[in-house]
Amino acid sequence: VTSIGMYAFSGCSSLTSVTIPNSVTSIENYAFCRCSSLTSINIPNSVTWIGVSAFKGCSSLSIVICKAILVPSAGKDVFAYVPISSAVLYVPDESVDIYKYMEPWSEFGTMLPISQVPTDVEDVQISSDKDASVKKVIRNGQVVILHNDKSYNIMGQEVE
């Protein structure tokens, strides 16, 4: 697969997380448009183009990891109707300064180097609570942290 086709996953309301394969070089127009439950996207270094409205209306999107050292070209309204001002964008350490000046990437509320992506349970911070118990489990192939009857992913987001 070298391209995620036009409208390929558009409207998939049950899609919560996407990791694009390393073989992909382009994400076409409206590919993930209106995936309202999508919370995170992982874009590989191989992607050079992201089409018009590719992630438009992904209203739950809060984390984007873009591993492309060379900033991918982007069509119009890639993140329209996405709360990117409160989302986190992780980019290659050596490219942070470039992404800061390139649209639509510059619109993200928080931009951090990829080296700061939480990678394990040890990176999750939970406020001190004397009676709390924290337990790491694997659920559906994902690491989940259980804390006071709630479940969290390794990014610290509450999950069901």
Where do the PLM segments sit?
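C-terminal outer-membrane/trafficking sorting elements
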Residues: 118-160
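Short, T/G/N/S-enriched strand-turn elements that build extracellular solenoid repeat scaffolds
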Residues: 52-56, 73-81, 100
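A recurrent domain-boundary module in secreted/ectodomain proteins
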Residues: 101-120
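Structural signature of tandem-repeat unit edges
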Residues: 1-3, 12-26, 35-49, 58-73, ...
